[in-house]
Amino acid sequence: MSKNYVEMGVYYMDKTIGLVRTVSRMSDYKTNDPMIGFVKVGEGGVASEMYAMPENVFKEKFIH
């Protein structure tokens, strides 16, 4: 896994958020900044609703 690129379909772990899987790339409609769409992976592998986070924030949180 690259240290400066968020890959799609990959699992990432954070102590506060937990296990997530990236599902899409998107853009903020106001600023046109890149965003990452992801789902939280719960007990038994069940996915949550989709969340979005700015790509730079996602990198800081999940890619150390």
Where are these regions (language model features)?
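Intrinsically disordered, low-complexity, charged/polar segments
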Residues: G44-H64
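Short coil-to-beta transition motif at edge beta-strands of beta-rich domains
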Residues: K3-T16
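Intrinsically disordered, low-complexity sequence elements enriched in Ser/Thr/Gly/Pro
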Residues: M1, L19, V23, V57-K59
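Short intrinsically disordered terminal tails
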Residues: M1-N4, I63-H64
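Basic/aromatic-rich interaction segments and small domains that mediate binding to polyanionic partners
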Residues: M13-Y51
